Amino acid sequence: MARIAGVDIPREKRIVISLTYVYGIGTSTANKIVEEANVSADTRVKDLTDDELGRIREVVDGYKVEGDLRREQNLNIKRLMEISSYRGIRHRRGLPVRGQKTKNNARTRKGPVKTVANKKK
């Protein structure tokens, strides 16, 4: 298996698909990387030469991926929470951040339903 940015990418798949196994690289970014490294997008990882793999690694090193990207995202969220912005407060409370309604749904963010016992009628 070839390692790019600390991730073992599958050998049998095309290079464009294999690059998407790296956190922070999607299909469009993978296409840009392959084009920048002058490698055919249809080439399978097992058929790549060491030179081509090296060029791809160099290009990927220019992107923020894996641990660096996760760390930056966490720091951004912590910063929002520290300055007590609206978004930071929503993160702190575990509620949707992007303006979604919460009266009915938002169960993914809020967690399982906490039932309250009804008064006896």
Curated annotation (Swiss-Prot):
Keywords: Ribonucleoprotein, Ribosomal protein, RNA-binding, rRNA-binding, tRNA-binding. Residues 91-121 are annotated as: Disordered. GO terms for biological process: translation. InterPro entries: Rbsml_uS13_C (IPR027437), Ribosomal_uS13 (IPR001892), Ribosomal_uS13-like_H2TH (IPR010979), Ribosomal_uS13_bac-type (IPR019980), Ribosomal_uS13_CS (IPR018269). Belongs to the universal ribosomal protein uS13 family. Part of the 30S ribosomal subunit. Forms a loose heterodimer with protein S19. Forms two bridges to the 50S subunit in the 70S ribosome. This is Small ribosomal subunit protein uS13. It comes from Staphylococcus epidermidis (strain ATCC 35984 / DSM 28319 / BCRC 17069 / CCUG 31568 / BM 3577 / RP62A).
